Curated annotation (Swiss-Prot):
An example Gene Ontology molecular-function term: ATP binding
GO CC annotations on file: cytoplasm
EC primary class: ligase
Cross-referenced PROSITE patterns: AA_TRNA_LIGASE_II
Its biological purpose: Catalyzes the attachment of serine to tRNA(Ser). Is also able to aminoacylate tRNA(Sec) with serine, to form the misacylated tRNA L-seryl-tRNA(Sec), which will be further converted into selenocysteinyl-tRNA(Sec).
Protein name: Serine--tRNA ligase
Keywords: Aminoacyl-tRNA synthetase, ATP-binding, Cytoplasm, Ligase, Nucleotide-binding, Protein biosynthesis
Pathways involved: Aminoacyl-tRNA biosynthesis; selenocysteinyl-tRNA(Sec) biosynthesis; L-seryl-tRNA(Sec) from L-serine and tRNA(Sec): step 1/1
Family of this protein: Belongs to the class-II aminoacyl-tRNA synthetase family. Type-1 seryl-tRNA synthetase subfamily.
SUPFAM superfamilies (alphabetical): Class II aaRS and biotin synthetases, tRNA-binding arm
Alphabetical GO biological process terms: selenocysteine biosynthetic process; seryl-tRNA aminoacylation
Length: 428
């Protein structure tokens, strides 16, 4: 969430920025009214507490003098009832304010280009040259089915649309990709491999910003009465980032760099009719995630570093891609600055997103109460959190099938993956 002090001290300015940069309309009148109620109730609560404490002290003194204290006891009792009622009202107002604040997106960094949607994103550069084929290229679905490695019909039978069964050498290639990515990030980029639960509680989802706004995008468990509800993770960012929730970290230990390979589960609400063919938009897909927890003054520099580490995967796989700086209208809810990496897909004759790398500033840290402290300063401050795909495994598989296809329908295995494939140079 954004800093409540910004809302209290610069509400009109923040509201205007949200409207212009995020197309988000903040109800200024309602929030102002609730803030006035909060301040009034806060003052009344503190006044009642102070008065009750003073009266309680008087009771002790009167009792010591042997005086009748029944009237004083009655006053304190009634004051306690009024205090409880006022506190309850204050809690209600605070909860209402909190619900509003939790729905407010992060403010973009100043350097983020203003724009309404993805058409106004800014291309930073391109890497690699798309291959020219001397035959009609096939898409990954035709290639995978021809090699009997992608079985979408089985996915439908077992689960429904947007699921797949992988088999044989294609399944092995899919596994090889995740192993290659993890090895690269742990051995060369300094990340600690992390294994996390795939089911998380609601506090975890609030921490990284999936709840309350994006509940419909999640797959939720049907909790029995009295049991804690869970949801399947939409990305490893959720459990990995929440490892620092309610923690005070030593600044000397920062940055914390963690990577995890997990399946990701998304309902794809609002995506009806989009990318219905193939692996591009699935309910279940694998991803290798990069997460960094850093000191605030380093986060913009770290965003460049983290994005470069995701780029390295594409470069070693020799897959042409482009780097795009997202405009304000296309950024994620909690991000202050995001780069997308888009890989070239020959069958679509276009670049498609394969990684999104974001600096969340202190947006998630404030929700999680994740703080750090230096040895020279006893005061704590919020950390900054960053995350990025390093990479989406299924989409990387798509890119390899299409970019490394041969005229006879076989697939050349990229050289960096051959050690993970038992030396296999060609599929099919």
């Amino acid at each position: 969430m954004i800093d409540p002090n910004l809302l209290r001290n610069n509400l009109e300015e923040v509201a205007e920025k949200l409207k212009v940069k995020r197309n988000f309309v903040l109800d200024v009148a309602l929030l102002s009214e609730l803030e006035e109620q909060r301040k009034s109730l806060q003052v009344k609560t503190e006044s009642l507490q102070a008065e009750r404490n003073a009266r309680s002290k008087n009771i002790g003194q009167a009792k010591a003098r042997g005086e009748d204290i029944s009237a004083l006891l009655n006053e304190v009792e009634h004051m306690g009832i009024e205090l409880s009622t006022t506190k309850a009202h204050l809690d209600e107002v605070l909860a209402e304010i909190n619900q509003i604040v939790l729905a407010i997106p992060n403010l973009p960094a100043d350097e983020v280009p203003l724009g309404k949607d993805e058409s106004e994103n800014l291309e930073v550069f391109r890497w690699g040259t798309p291959k020219t084929f001397d035959f009609d290229v096939k898409d990954h679905v035709s290639l995978g089915e021809g090699l009997k490695g992608l079985d979408f019909a089985a996915g439908v039978k077992l689960s429904g649309s947007r699921f797949v069964v992988m088999k044989g050498q294609i399944a092995k290639l899919h596994r090889a990709l995740s192993q290659f990515m993890l090895d690269l990030h742990t051995e060369q980029h300094g990340y600690t491999e992390t294994y996390v639960p795939y089911l998380v509680n609601h506090a975890t989802l609030y921490g990284t910003g999936q709840l309350p706004k994006f509940g419909e995008d999640l797959f939720h468990t049907n909790a029995l009465e009295g049991e804690q509800p869970y949801a399947l993770i939409p990305t490893a960012e959720v459990p990995v980032t929440n490892l620092v929730r309610d923690e005070i970290l030593d600044e000397a230990d920062l940055p914390l760099k963690m990577t995890a390979h997990t399946p990701c589960f998304r309902s794809e609400a609002g995506s009806y009719g989009r990318d219905t063919r193939g692996l591009i938009r699935m309910h279940q897909f694998d991803k290798v995630e990069l997460v960094q927890i850093v000191a605030p003054e380093t986060s913009m520099q770290v965003l460049e570093e983290l994005t470069g580490q995701a780029e390295k995967v594409l470069q070693l796989l020799e897959l042409p891609y482009r780097k795009v700086l997202l405009c304000t209208g296309d950024m994620g809810f909690g991000s202050c600055k995001t780069y997308d990496l888009e890989v070239w897909l020959p069958a679509q004759n276009t670049y498609r997103e394969i990684s999104s790398c974001s600096n969340m500033w202190d947006f998630q840290a404030r929700r999680m109460q994740a703080r750090c402290r230096s040895k020279t300063d006893k005061k704590t401050r919020l950390v900054h959190t960053l995350n990025g795909s390093g990479l989406a495994v299924g989409r990387t598989l798509v890119a390899i099938l299409e970019n490394y296809q041969n005229a006879d329908g076989t697939i050349t295995v990229p050289s960096v993956l051959r050690p993970y494939m038992g030396g296999l140079a060609q599929i099919g």
